[in-house]
């Protein structure tokens, strides 16, 4: 059964991890917001993650090869309880998507 899990990424590597995970056909979600950055009389708008250092991934841990995720570029680890990844409660990601979009 597909459930949402949390990935802890290496510092400022969310986009790299997303790229690598999507290349392997994983369903990944990283809520972002537009930030205005002022530097040396220039104003830039950049996308930043709402949860820096974290991504959400939708997996079926009984079917998907989740152990390899921990070894992907940009990924620190898939959050777990010591043995298996810890799934988020049903509906949390849906609520985040509704509030952000």
What are these regions (language model features)?
Residues 1-101:
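Acidic-enriched and Gly/Ser
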């Amino acid at each position: 059964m597909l459930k949402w899990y949390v990935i802890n990424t290496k510092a400022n590597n969310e986009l790299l991890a997303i790229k690598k995970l999507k290349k392997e056909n994983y369903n990944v979600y990283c809520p972002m917001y537009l930030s205005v950055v002022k530097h040396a009389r220039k104003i830039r708008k950049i996308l930043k993650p709402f949860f820096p250092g974290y991504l959400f991934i939708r997996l079926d841990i009984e079917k998907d090869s989740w152990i390899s995720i921990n070894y992907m570029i940009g990924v620190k680890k898939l959050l777990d309880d010591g043995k298996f990844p810890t799934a988020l409660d049903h509906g949390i990601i849906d609520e985040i998507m509704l509030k952000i979009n």
